[in-house]
Amino acid sequence: MAIRLHQSDADFEARFAALLAAKREVSEDVDSTVRTILADVRARGDQAVIDYTARFDRLPLTPETLAVGEAEFAAAELAVEDKTRAALTLARDRIRAHHERQKPQDDRYTDALGVELGSRWTAIEAVGLYVPGGTASYPSSVLMNAVPAKVAGVDRVVMVVPTPDGVVNPLVLVAAKLAGVDELYRIGGAQAIGALAYGTATIPPVYKIVGPGNAYVAAAKRQVFGTVGIDMMAGPSEVLILADGANDPDWLAADLLAQAEHDTAAQAMIMTDDAALADAVEAAVERQLKTLPRGETAAASWRDFGAVIVVDDLEAALPLANRIAPEHLEIAVADPEPLLAGVRNAGAIFIGRSTPEVIGDYVGGSNHVLPTARSARFSSGLSVLDFMKRTSILRTGPEQLRALGPAAITLAEAEGLGAHARSVAIRLNL
């Protein structure tokens, strides 16, 4: 059973703090192994990647067969049902339309002194996308990562996906084609991250790597950071639902289980001011668990990390929700706008009873790559801006240099940087 908390209980704060502090993911100590793999890939390039792929994925490759070819994309198209392809296309189009609105504008202006300032936005030239492999890999994640990159103007989107025993989900290939992925390689693990970061004879390096992966992939991303950029260190999925008593408990239970079925370490939580609804939701969760194909996974998640929190009123839930800073926040109340105004920390917010979080996973248009493990307190979900760089622009003419130069010289001398001061003074004949 999920943990049950009542805000009116004397030990509520201690138990709530323990809920926040609970560690949901056991990190394997893989840094040493990953460091060895990365060094090997950096030294031996293609051959190291091929050797590790044979060892871990049981797939013999050559430099010529690292890339997925057009014949395989064509076969994947034939293997995917028309209605599924149409759904992927709808999702792609909605993601593209929403992310087009995120594109920033260049800014140039001249201030009162006549100094010209501004900012210029340019796309990262090459981005790598890691997609977990096997038949359980998610085509929606391909769209969520690759489409914003292409909207940003990235010239070269390179996708890597492990194919254990040669198996790859055809939906992933179709999604890659729809999203505009430029290159796709059948490699995974830390060795794929190394190939993207350092490059090989077959795979030119990229400048940033995005996408989720296991402990080895996460460690590899951490270790190559600085050589390349990375997106975020994502953990298990989570949802928090703020609900009033007028909700259908079966709807809420379905939303909770939609997160719980992801992973035994996923977390599904609900806050309500109605104890009777809390009871009904718990009962509905138990009923629905018996019918789910991934019921065993969802049951473990609900048992170990689920939470039902009864608050004095929904306004009192807001400070608690902001402390949780959930990846996904559903506001399932009659009038959600006042509560929405008080939300400071959440990866994404789903407003009203008719907006289940799952719509955001697939076809809403907003991005489902979101901060987890309370990192929504200081970070945002994936967007077009993650694939762009802002460069400052400054121009001073002779008059502006005469006006500003003496102050620059004074500050440079105060910092003991004589060459800095001379750089300005020499232009002013000082």
Report the location of each language-model feature.
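N-terminal Rossmann-like NAD(P)+-binding subdomain of aldehyde/semialdehyde dehydrogenases
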Residues: 1-125
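Flexible, glycine/charged-enriched surface loops at secondary-structure junctions
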Residues: 104-109, 229, 266-271, 291-302, ...
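Short internal beta-strands
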Residues: 155-164, 268-274, 279
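A glycine- and small/hydrophobic-rich beta-loop-beta segment
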Residues: 262, 270-346
